[in-house]
A protein has these predicted regions:
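Generic hydrophobic, helix-prone segments enriched in Leu/Val/Ile
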Residues: 50, 255-258
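RNA/tRNA-interacting regions in translation and RNA-turnover enzymes
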Residues: 1-242, 272-326
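Intrinsic, low-complexity polybasic segments
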Residues: 238-245, 249-251, 256, 263, ...
Length: 327
């Protein structure tokens, strides 16, 4: 497997399963769960990839191994390149798409839909399973260019845990072998570690938490909630006050008042005293946690919105002395 798209496709897992009975019926329990999720059962191999996507959130694809030539690669499409998709339409591509290729041609539109010529059928006896991580920016808007709206595309646009591909591969393999038999080969994985998304630590200030929620949540409760959500929490006895002020403070705002932004932060941080708080790191699956306010929202949600007191916002009145011109 070769990755030639940089940060757009930093991880790809593949596995060959030979000797499968692709005509085996999808188990009733799986077909019923797919139907209840709004997905029409098609065939065992396709249904397994769809089911794993629903359970784990990792889109997958199955290729008929007999239709592939040579090694697999992921690259940017070329302007004027065409690909016949699973739904039978011919997609005319520009250079903004990601494609999965074999030695001869594009065989799939990465993160969106597989190719028609390499699809699995009831006659398939060997399958190549794909589970990959594609960056949201590389998939976003590409489906709409072609009028495609797929479950895989919607998930990749919003972000998928980069640690999921191998987990999903093992789960899908187990389900296929249990029902259709076959001999799975080793997982072939290609990774560009420098391009994988890495969660950044977020500083949560105790003073900011109390100010936003309007109540004091104990240190033990804050740490219990965050750890229960799978976050890594490190207690900070003190923070440098300057480091506690978010970037952007003191720059000109819409009114052209450079001091206004800094003054609005006065209630959130004290530049003369240490600010206590926590350094929190979210797991790779939590794309929705990126800033301090996201952490505060999680604490409020678990602690209980009903426990937040109802109070009117307090504002400080400021009297402006009339100038001589206005008089």
């Amino acid at each position: 497997v070769e990755l030639n798209a940089g940060a757009a496709a930093p991880r790809y897992c593949g596995r060959v399963i030979e000797g499968v009975d692709a005509a085996a019926p999808t188990p009733l329990w799986m077909a019923e769960r797919l139907r209840r999720s709004g997905i029409r059962p098609i065939s065992l191999l396709v249904d397994v990839t769809q089911y794993v996507m629903l359970e784990l959130g990792q889109p997958m694809h199955a290729y008929d191994l007999g239709t592939l030539q040579g090694s697999i690669a992921v690259r940017r499409s070329r302007a004027g390149e065409t690909l016949k998709l699973l739904d039978g339409r011919d997609a005319a591509l520009d250079d903004s798409f990601l494609v999965v290729t074999d030695a001869d041609r594009a065989v799939g539109l990465a993160g969106l839909m597989g190719g028609f010529d390499t699809r699995v059928t009831d006659a398939t006896t060997a399958v190549f399973l794909e589970a990959a991580h594609f960056a949201p920016a590389a998939i976003m808007g590409r489906g709409r260019k072609l009028g495609l709206h797929t479950d895989a595309g919607h998930r990749f646009e919003r972000g998928v845990d980069p640690e999921l591909p191998r987990i999903a591969m093992e789960y899908a393999t187990r389900l296929i072998v249990e029902v259709a038999g076959g001999a799975p080969g080793p997982v072939v994985e290609a990774t560009l570690a420098q391009h994988l998304p890495r969660p950044q630590p977020i500083v949560l200030r105790r003073a900011r938490l109390a100010r936003v929620l309007g109540l004091q949540v104990s240190d033990a409760e804050v740490e219990r909630i965050l750890r229960a959500l799978g976050l890594t929490v490190e207690r900070l006895a003190a923070l440098d006050g300057a480091a506690a002020i978010p970037s952007g403070v003191g720059v000109a705002d819409g009114a052209g008042d450079a001091d206004a932004t800094a003054s609005r932060m006065a209630g959130d941080t004290d530049t003369t005293q240490a600010v206590q708080g926590w350094r929190v790191t979210a797991p790779t699956r939590r794309f929705d946690i990126a800033i301090e306010e996201d952490l505060i929202e999680e604490i409020a949600r678990i602690h209980g919105y009903d426990r937040i007191p109802t109070t009117l916002p307090a504002g400080a009145a400021r009297l402006v002395a009339p100038t001589e011109t206005r008089v």
